[in-house]
Design a protein with these regions (language model features):
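Glycine- (often His-adjacent) and acidic-residue-rich active-site loop
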Residues: 64-99, 118, 264
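Crotonase-fold acyl-CoA enzyme core
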Residues: 101-212
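Terminal peptide-recognition signature
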Residues: 25, 29, 43-44, 62, ...
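Conserved CoA-thioester-binding segment of acyl-CoA-metabolizing enzymes
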Residues: 2-65
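C-terminal alpha-helix plus adjacent terminal tail
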Residues: 1-19, 173-178, 198, 202-205, ...
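A general structural signal for well-ordered alpha-helical segments in protein cores
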Residues: 96, 153, 162-165, 215-218, ...
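Charged catalytic carboxylate motif
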Residues: 39-43, 95, 102, 199, ...
């Protein structure tokens, strides 16, 4: 029997497909490595809400079109239209935070299918999913501090522990292989190149066959254990810290965005990388 399929576009930025009882949500800016601008994040939130409200959907897969899961939040768009001060930054960062955490809070199980880069906000988005599958091309990292930005969704300590989290965040590492990510507990499984989506879909179909009320209540209990340990309060504190950082405006971030405006994002990244080259 062939699977039931229904494909819709939320916009050109987010694709939504139903395969049997699974919603497959795809970030869809492949020409920009699925960099997440504010329009995409709004549609991503709407896609998550759509899956939550649809009784036919019992599991969700999140992936990226083309050669990347996502390069993270859109720095080119930020350079072209930079918020000023805490009051302008607060709603932007809250939208970023909510879009990522919607996959953590969804009552239905969520599975990330990662290939290529999953950096900064996209790394955080992949962590927010219940299960993360990565193919052998996947690269993870949190490079924000290297260009003067803070961490929007500081899930990393809860996934890999304080020592690894501090190393990754404070050094701004952005070259963590799938193998390294698996060893530190950042992802669940590594699969051959190009098999991440098929594997994630297979897992999601298995999850969809479990009683939906049982699944929702058990996921809620699992999430509650982290809340009792203080995760939600810690995440809110980190979000407020990032809001203050961006509102204040770090000199490195100002320089990075200026180079991005004048010479392009690639030149800005080259300049950023030069700051932390080995002596």
């Amino acid at each position: 029997m062939l699977p039931y399929r229904q494909t819709d576009k939320m916009t050109e930025l987010v694709l939504y497909e139903q395969i049997d009882a699974v919603a497959v949500i795809s970030l869809n800016r492949p020409e920009r490595l699925n960099a997440m601008d504010q329009a995409m994040l709004k549609e991503l939130n709407q896609a998550a809400e759509r899956a939550e409200q649809d009784d036919r959907i019992r599991a969700v897969v999140l992936t990226g079109a083309g050669n990347a899961f996502s390069s993270g939040f859109d720095l080119k768009a930020q350079a072209e239209n930079t918020p000023q001060g805490v009051n302008e930054w607060r709603p932007v960062l809250k939208r970023n935070f909510d879009a990522c955490m919607s996959f953590w809070h969804l009552a239905k199980p969520t599975v990330a299918a990662v290939h290529g880069p999953a950096l900064a906000g996209a790394c955080e988005l992949s962590m927010a999913c219940d299960i993360t599958i990565a193919d052998e091309t996947a690269i993870f990292g949190e490079p924000e501090l290297r260009f003067g930005a803070g961490i929007v969704v500081m899930l990393l300590p809860w996934m890999v522990g304080p020592k690894r989290a501090k190393e990754i965040i404070l050094l701004g590492l952005d070259d963590i292989s799938a193998r390294e990510a698996k060893e530190m507990g950042l992802i669940n499984r590594i699969v051959p190149k190009g098999e991440d989506l098929n594997t994630a879909l297979s897992i999601a179909k298995k999850l969809s066959r479990i009683d939906s009320s049982l699944m929702a209540q058990t996921k809620q209990a699992l999430n509650r254990s982290y809340a009792i340990m203080g995760m939600e309060e810690a995440l809110e504190f980190a979000l407020e810290t990032d809001t203050q950082i961006e509102g204040e405006g770090m000199p490195t971030k100002a320089k990075f965005l200026q180079i991005a405006r004048d010479q392009g994002l690639r030149a800005a990244i080259t300049w950023r990388d030069s700051l932390t080259e080995d002596d």
